[in-house]
């Protein structure tokens, strides 16, 4: 009889143990899952925040570069409008050449500085190659009247700025070799009599822009 009672007591004890163990194990499993999920979610949020920061800082670097180019364009165009025309309102090409030469030499950021007249002909052009500015002789100046950036800039109002897409540079109707990607920043130019006389174009190297963007993202 005592053994039967003992067996009953052991069975009751086992039932009680299981009744306690199952909720405890379930609670432990839920806790472990919540802990793992919390860590994973924290890592995910941290990674996403880091990526957003990378993109934000790289975008800031890109915006800073573009803002600097626009500031340079406004500065040079204003200077040419004040100093680049005679009392009769006609272009003083030599004066504009010297202004452009000094500008591109000091800045060292631009592939070309150009003044195009109302017909789209280059009247002044300074290249920057091998670390030095180079004046382009009159017989080497080109007709750019069919180029999209000329037509779109000519349609602008005073104070408006044209910024081209990043594309390949074209010389004499052909893609320049070696390949050179550029962005063109341009504004209409007005003489001292308030008449539109052409456009000023800055060619900014796309490689420099992309390099600055990549450097900003990589250094974070």
Predicted regions: what they are:
Residues 52, 70, 97-100, 147-150, ...:
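Extracytoplasmic/secreted envelope proteins and their assembly/folding machinery
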Residues 63, 67-97, 118-135, 219:
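Extracellular/periplasmic ligand-binding regions of membrane signal-transduction receptors
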Residues 69-74, 104-129, 144, 155-162, ...:
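Short N-terminal helix-loop-first-beta-strand/juxtamembrane motif that initiates sensory/input modules
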Residues 127-203:
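Extracytoplasmic/periplasmic ligand-binding sensor regions of membrane-associated signaling proteins
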Residues 13-16, 24-89, 105-109, 181-182:
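Juxtamembrane extracytoplasmic/periplasmic/luminal helical "stalk" adjacent to the first N-terminal
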Residues 1-10, 50, 87, 155-167, ...:
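N-terminal sensory and localization modules of signal-transduction and trafficking proteins
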Residues 93-107, 139, 171-172, 193-195, ...:
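Solvent-exposed, extracytoplasmic
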């Amino acid at each position: 009889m005592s053994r039967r009672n003992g067996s009953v007591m052991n069975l009751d004890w086992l039932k009680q143990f299981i009744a306690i163990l199952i909720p405890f194990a379930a609670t432990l499993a839920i806790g472990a899952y919540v802990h793992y999920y919390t860590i994973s979610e924290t890592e995910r949020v941290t990674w996403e925040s880091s990526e957003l920061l990378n993109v934000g800082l790289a975008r800031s670097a890109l915006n800073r570069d573009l803002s600097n180019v626009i500031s340079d364009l406004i500065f040079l165009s204003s200077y040419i409008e004040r100093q680049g025309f005679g009392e009769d309102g006609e272009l003083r090409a030599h004066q504009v050449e010297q202004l452009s030469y000094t500008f591109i030499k000091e800045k060292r950021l631009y592939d070309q500085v150009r003044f195009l007249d109302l017909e789209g002909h280059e009247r002044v052009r300074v290249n920057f190659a091998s670390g030095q500015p180079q004046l382009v002789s009159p017989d080497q100046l080109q007709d750019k009247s069919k180029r999209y950036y000329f037509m779109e800039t000519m349609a602008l109002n005073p104070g408006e700025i044209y910024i081209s897409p990043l594309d390949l540079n074209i010389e004499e109707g052909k893609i320049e070799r070696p390949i050179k990607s550029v962005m063109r920043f341009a504004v209409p130019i007005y003489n001292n009599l308030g008449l539109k006389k052409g456009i000023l174009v800055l060619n900014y190297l796309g490689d420099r822009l992309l390099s600055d963007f990549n450097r900003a993202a990589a250094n974070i």
